[in-house]
Amino acid sequence: VTSDVQWEIRARADREAIFRYLYQEAGLPVASATDDKLVSMVSILRENPLAGVKAGRTAKQRKLVVPHFPFIIVYVAEETVVRILRVLHTSRKVASRYSRS
């Protein structure tokens, strides 16, 4: 079963901030490669919504580690949709940042 993917507002803002920072610090190729990797990891969730491990405050909340990149994707897998909640750098204190609000 293929799920739809919905990027929540905070996740879209995270993705944009990551791209902007990497573009300024390392250039377009690095920013683009990182964004491509994030998109490819999220595409895995379309086919396998339970690919990540349980995390966060609710039973449905999960996280997917992005290999070779210092990011995790925080998401909720529902029946027909995967909602991407956040894209966070692994150095951040992430436990308190899993909330949707």
State the predicted function of each range.
Residues 1-61:
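Basic, Lys/Arg-enriched alpha-helical interface segments
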